[in-house]
């Protein structure tokens, strides 16, 4: 579960990590009132879970009430990389002299958590990692002992953080690790961590991803789950109990089993397509569950075709076929082309059940993916 910026900053503030004064607003009038209360200049920031909000027009710095009204009116209601903006965070602007990056995640290759520090904050850290990996200092942590203060200071100094703020940066890094461990986070980061001219450090942005399987241990975070859903589709996925990730392409993908879905994503990319989503219907899926999956994918306006990749083990091919037929028979006209590949338990029965007036059936995964990619290209 990925928290919104305002939610993550609330968690940070409760842990004692400095964050700018801010107020959440859902109307233009609320945004202007919040800006007046905080005092100008303020930043008005779209609360949607996408990167590059600033470049896409989702973050604006304003100097007065008129500018605040104009910015809030422009941002509220906009579609930002496919997500509808219905809330903004009105936040005190930070006058900074430097931008840093700090974060904690799991290094699966090392089998340990890793804390990271860089003086290249305020930019896409993935690009920094690719172009100049030495610009990010990594410090592995033994989870049995936690992060020692000396490790955090070592990472800050090795990264080249100014001595005047190195101890404060190290303290925040230690707090981030403690949050990462205590809240069962999978990733936590601040980018940028701003340094002011009077040597204060402030978390100007916040990213926090929580292991959904551990939410039962955190009632405070569980309460945030509905609001944390990035859009209506993700909220619907939670309701249906699907593992779903929205992507930026136009070929919808439905499968049973994470590995099978990932393989399908890779093949869509291999054959020149762009995946629109990751959707795993799980094992033993009945007709209703399959119909719900199709309803979800069709609800994404970016989808131009859909490919089903089902391998029957617990999930029976005939049940899947019934679900596909039931879902498609609800439409007077099929919204988008659907390609189906069935294999395994009762696959032959399933292919006989499928209404070929509604779907295209392919025997191999490669053929199914190529057909779906072709359909998506033709729909554009």
Curated annotation (Swiss-Prot):
Q: Identify the GO cellular component terms for this protein.
A: succinate-CoA ligase complex
Where is substrate annotated to bind? 256, 313-315
Q: Which GO terms describe its molecular function?
A: ATP binding; magnesium ion binding; succinate-CoA ligase (ADP-forming) activity; succinate-CoA ligase (GDP-forming) activity
Q: Which InterPro entries match?
A: ATP-grasp, ATP-grasp_succ-CoA_synth-type, ATP_grasp_subdomain_1, Succ-CoA_synthase_bsu_CS, SUCC_ACL_C, Succ_CoA_ligase-like_bsu, Succinyl-CoA_synth-like
**Keywords per UniProt:** ATP-binding, Ligase, Magnesium, Metal-binding, Nucleotide-binding, Tricarboxylic acid cycle
Domain ATP-grasp spans what residues? 9-236
Pathway listed: Carbohydrate metabolism; tricarboxylic acid cycle; succinate from succinyl-CoA (ligase route): step 1/1
Pfam families reported in the protein's UniProt record: ATP-grasp_2 (PF08442), Ligase_CoA (PF00549)
**What is the uppermost EC class here?**
ligase
Record-annotated membrane-spanning stretches = none
Q: Which reaction does it catalyse?
A: succinate + ATP + CoA = succinyl-CoA + ADP + phosphate; GTP + succinate + CoA = succinyl-CoA + GDP + phosphate
Q: Where does ATP bind?
A: 45, 52-54, 91, 94, 99
Cofactor comment = Binds 1 Mg(2+) ion per subunit.
Listed EC numbers: 6.2.1.5
Q: Which GO terms are recorded in the biological process aspect for this UniProt protein?
A: succinyl-CoA metabolic process; tricarboxylic acid cycle
Cofactor(s) recorded in Swiss-Prot or TrEMBL: Mg(2+)
- Chain sites annotated for binding Mg(2+): 191, 205
The chain's disulfide connectivity reads none
Q: How does it assemble?
A: Heterotetramer of two alpha and two beta subunits.
Biological function: Succinyl-CoA synthetase functions in the citric acid cycle (TCA), coupling the hydrolysis of succinyl-CoA to the synthesis of either ATP or GTP and thus represents the only step of substrate-level phosphorylation in the TCA. The beta subunit provides nucleotide specificity of the enzyme and binds the substrate succinate, while the binding sites for coenzyme A and phosphate are found in the alpha subunit.
Protein family according to the UniProt entry: Belongs to the succinate/malate CoA ligase beta subunit family.
**Protein name, please?**
Succinate--CoA ligase [ADP-forming] subunit beta
Gene source species? Natronomonas pharaonis (strain ATCC 35678 / DSM 2160 / CIP 103997 / JCM 8858 / NBRC 14720 / NCIMB 2260 / Gabara)
Its gene?
Answer: sucC
